[in-house]
């Protein structure tokens, strides 16, 4: 059986990472461990629960980044008018 940190049955007890990159790296590690098929059932369920939480963190961070880009871009995000390019 795998005895790595990824398969730790206490993964649900650890605090969630607050940054996208750390959450994504942990999520990828959990997915890899589950895909190997060597985790016992309880550890697989624990890893799956943790993975769902990490996926939510990633989705939230991406949504926040998208909102920041929209705010920064403001009116610049509009369809391209080819006729306007001809006038220049």
UniProtKB/Swiss-Prot annotation:
Family of the protein in this entry: Belongs to the XseB family.
Major localization class: cytoplasm
UniProt-listed InterPro entries: Exonuc_VII_S, Exonuc_VII_ssu_sf
Localization annotation: Cytoplasm
Assembly mode: Heterooligomer composed of large and small subunits.
HAMAP family: Exonuc_7_S
Reactions performed catalytically: Exonucleolytic cleavage in either 5'- to 3'- or 3'- to 5'-direction to yield nucleoside 5'-phosphates
Name the record gives this protein: Exodeoxyribonuclease 7 small subunit
Keyword Cytoplasm carried by entry: yes
Enzyme class: hydrolase
Record key words, sorted: Cytoplasm, Exonuclease, Hydrolase, Nuclease
EC id: 3.1.11.6
Gene Ontology cellular-component annotations: cytosol; exodeoxyribonuclease VII complex
Coiled coil: none
GO molecular function: exodeoxyribonuclease VII activity
GO biological process entries: DNA catabolic process
Biological role stated in the UniProt entry: Bidirectionally degrades single-stranded DNA into large acid-insoluble oligonucleotides, which are then degraded further into small acid-soluble oligonucleotides.
């Amino acid at each position: 059986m795998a005895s790595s940190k990824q398969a730790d049955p206490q993964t649900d007890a650890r605090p969630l990472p607050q940054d996208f990159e750390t959450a994504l790296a942990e999520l990828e590690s959990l997915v890899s461990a589950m895909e190997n098929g060597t985790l016992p059932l309880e550890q697989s369920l624990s890893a799956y629960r943790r993975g769902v939480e990490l996926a939510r963190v990633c989705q939230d961070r991406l949504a926040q980044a998208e909102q920041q880009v929209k705010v920064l871009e403001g009116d610049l995000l509009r369809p391209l008018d080819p006729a306007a390019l001809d006038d220049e």
